Amino acid sequence: MARYRGPVVKIMRREGVDLFLKSSYTFNKDKFHRKGPPGMPTKRKGKVSEYGTQLREKQKLKRAYGLLEKQFRNYYEEASHSHGVTGEILLQLLERRLDNVVYRLGFAVTRRQARNFIAHRHVLVNGERVDIPSYRLNVGDKVEIREKFRASTFIADNIRLSQSLQGIPSWLSADYTNFGGDVTALPERHHIDLPVKEQVIVELYSK
């Protein structure tokens, strides 16, 4: 499946916010906080149109979860045909992806790294190997790191970093002794720390 594999700090500068695409080990905040988006500097900054604002919010969310347009559109279509608030359901569907849960549990420092672990079959769901990053988890599902990969320095370092920095969302429970975690509830809007206005994205797609 196609993926963006280019520089991620440039993406975050374009969106103007930290999308948690870069590990804290290697994140150069000086680069991120350079004034303005990447590219040649411009003398004037024109007023952003309503469409421009909607587009930027969509791009932020797509890029945070590492999705291309077709994938993202499919999530939106599913959310729009579900009962409830479309924007919140969209976020919930994205949060329930396996790559995101591996990241949220602290076994990976970025969603991109989590996708790599999953693609190499280092992750188990309910005792079975799963190599699909978009695999959707349900309440009661158990995620584990494969036994042969548990000794990796990546995992030990990531767990230490996670415990000291981000913490685990309350809809998940982590068991670091056994290199696993459980989905204990469905994520709600207040659990999701991304600086995105999901209703603006709904307005863009509903035109």
Swiss-Prot record:
The protein, known as: Small ribosomal subunit protein uS4
NCBIfam families: PRK05327.1, rpsD_bact
Ranges of residues in domain S4 RNA-binding: 96-159
Swiss-Prot/TrEMBL keywords: Ribonucleoprotein, Ribosomal protein, RNA-binding, rRNA-binding
Classification via Gene3D superfamilies: Ribosomal Protein S4 Delta 41, Chain A, domain 1, RNA-binding S4 domain
InterPro entries: Ribosomal_uS4, Ribosomal_uS4_bac-type, Ribosomal_uS4_CS, Ribosomal_uS4_N, S4_RNA-bd, S4_RNA-bd_sf
Quaternary context: Part of the 30S ribosomal subunit. Contacts protein S5. The interaction surface between S4 and S5 is involved in control of translational fidelity.
Superkingdom, taxonomy of origin: Bacteria
Lineage of origin: Bacteria, Pseudomonadati, Spirochaetota, Spirochaetia, Leptospirales
Pfam families reported for this sequence: Ribosomal_S4, S4
SMART domains cross-referenced by the UniProt entry: Ribosomal_S4, S4
HAMAP family: Ribosomal_uS4_B
Function in brief: One of the primary rRNA binding proteins, it binds directly to 16S rRNA where it nucleates assembly of the body of the 30S subunit.
Taxonomic source organism: Leptospira borgpetersenii serovar Hardjo-bovis (strain JB197)
Family: Belongs to the universal ribosomal protein uS4 family.
GO biological process, one term: ribosomal small subunit biogenesis
Alphabetical list of PROSITE patterns matching this protein: RIBOSOMAL_S4, S4
GO-annotated cellular components: small ribosomal subunit
Any one GO MF annotation of this record: rRNA binding
